[in-house]
Swiss-Prot record:
Part of the Notch signaling pathway. One of its GO terms (molecular function) is ubiquitin protein ligase binding. Keywords: Coiled coil, Developmental protein, Differentiation, Neurogenesis, Notch signaling pathway. It holds the Pfam family ESM4. This is Enhancer of split m4 protein. Disulfide bonds: none annotated. One of its GO terms (biological process) is nervous system development. It comes from Drosophila melanogaster (Fruit fly). The gene is E(spl)m4-BFM. Belongs to the M4-like protein family. Residues 23-61 form a coiled coil.
Amino acid sequence: MCQNKINTNNTMTIKSNKKLSYSVKKLLQKIFKQQQRVEEEQNLKNALKANSLESLESMENSRNADLESASICASLESCENEANERLSQSCEIEDYDFEQLPTVPVHFVRTAHGTFFWTAVSDLPADNDLVEPLYCSTSNAIAIPQDRWVQA
């Protein structure tokens, strides 16, 4: 009888231990599952943030690519080329005889303070700058020397 009681006590203890370990195991599983869910949610949020940043970057890249695309650049270049062609067609290029144009001598001197340039128009004959010098009365005055200088 004692043996039966001990066996019964042992089986009850084993059953209670099994129940206790089972409940602890269930509790730990719930805790681990909850922790896993929290981590998965955080990973999902982080992935969404990364995707949104990547999508923003890809949108910006595609926008820049569109701006640099050949169609836009080509249209701008074609507009510019057309404007240049129209301008060149509207302007008639005339051949100038440079022998008739008076030359203005440019003098220069290099010093420790820099290089100085100046022009002297005293070499021009009287009334040479007039359109029709015969009809103007300037008494054939000699041009006043107008020296201009600049430091380079």
